[in-house]
Amino acid sequence: VVSTSFQKEIPFETQTQKDSTLYIGETVTVTEGKAGAAEIESETVYKNGAEQSSRILSENVIIKPVSQVVRVGTKTKDVLKSGLLYPLKGTISSYFGERWGRNHEGLDIAVAEGTPVKAAECGTVSFAGDGGSYGNLVKIDHGNGVVTAYAHLNEINVVVGQAVNSNTQIALSGNTGRSTGPHLHFEIVKNDVPLDPLNYLKNRNS
């Protein structure tokens, strides 16, 4: 029988507080979380050098963890009025409107595979996964019926329900789904109606 003692880290919890003065997707850390520690006493039984059983005799908290407190925004922004950021820089290879006899509902921006894709505005991820012909797809809900979509991705770096700030990396560009070459397909939708992104993008794409 061998008795041992060791310390174990106690992870901290994260508490969220809704804040109507912050926009959706914005967060402010009020209190930084700190892990705690516990002193563990254990007993292990060996027979002929082989471990037979082990049990915890006692567990005493010596440092209490400090919870992390984060304020989460609930205020909606009129992103169409204030303008959105280009999700990446590259050459526009296809514009919004009719293309090959059908309506093209966004912008195609030609870039090398693996180019970081940024959120055009703060919001909450409403979809992240296989979008069929869109390939790997991310959608961000910006409130007031406005959603942006980022398609043909190689890699997705966010999950559904995650709050993101503007210009936060959400993915890497790619060539997945129905695609004729490496590019990002970017859409802006208001109440399920596609809009021409060029009317609402505010930074120079160069």
Task: Give residue ranges: language-model regions.
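Membrane-proximal envelope biogenesis segments
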Residues: 1-83
